[in-house]
Design a protein with these regions (language model features):
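Conserved acetyl-CoA pyrophosphate-binding loop and the N-cap/start of the following alpha-helix
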Residues: 150-162
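Conserved small/polar residues in nucleotide/adenosyl-binding loops
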Residues: 166-169
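Conserved short hydrophobic patches within well-ordered secondary structure
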Residues: 48, 162-163
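A conserved beta-strand-loop-helix scaffold within acyl/acetyltransferase catalytic domains
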Residues: 34-149
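Context-gated lysine
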Residues: 14, 19-21, 28-30, 105, ...
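Conserved N-terminal entry element of GNAT/NAT acetyltransferase domains
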Residues: 2-39
């Protein structure tokens, strides 16, 4: 198992979190939601990979590498990263990687290039009629210092919804 990289300098992260990448503010806590890619925000991607590896190792998973970043994060038409940023703490609270079904590319055999492709045998009907209207979400994480034992990875949802939740399933 390799050591996890040190945190990325906050000035580098802030420089890449530009207004063009800002989706909106959260409903609570004055946090900000951004959408980035490894190509337009390489330092943010490194920090995402670091935080994912920290969180996943804590729960007995992880890649064993210095960061949790794979080919789906870095390929030409890479998955996008939705992150919650705390301007007050100047750090990433958590995030998801995602790909809209309408943006899915296909390999030379017509198979969708998705992180989950090895798990399913997608029918032609599914690919044509359903896939374009889906979103593949994955690699969700909440930075350890922002996790609660009650909400876990669902804490990102709760951060942005003003309704009081006792539990989510």
């Amino acid at each position: 198992m390799q050591d996890i990289i040190n945190p990325i300098d906050r000035a580098l992260l802030k420089a890449e979190l530009t207004k063009e990448k800002r989706l909106r503010s959260t409903n609570k806590s004055k946090n900000e939601i951004y959408i980035v890619t490894a190509h337009d925000s390489p330092n943010v991607m490194q920090e995402i990979g670091r935080l994912r590896e920290v969180a996943f190792r804590y729960y007995g998973g992880g890649t064993g590498f210095p960061v949790d970043i794979d080919e789906y994060d870095t390929m030409e038409d890479a998955y996008r990263q939705l992150i919650v940023w705390s301007p007050e703490d100047e750090q990433i609270l958590g995030g998801y990687r995602f790909l809209c079904g309408s943006d899915v590319k296909f390999d030379e055999n017509g198979k969708p290039i998705l992180a989950t492709s090895h798990l399913f045998n997608f029918s032609e009907k599914f690919i044509k009629e359903i896939l374009p209207y889906t979103v593949e979400l994955g690699r969700s994480f909440v930075a350890l210092e922002y996790q609660s034992t009650r909400s876990g990875a669902k804490g990102l949802f709760v951060l942005d919804n003003p309704v009081s939740y006792t539990h989510l399933t």
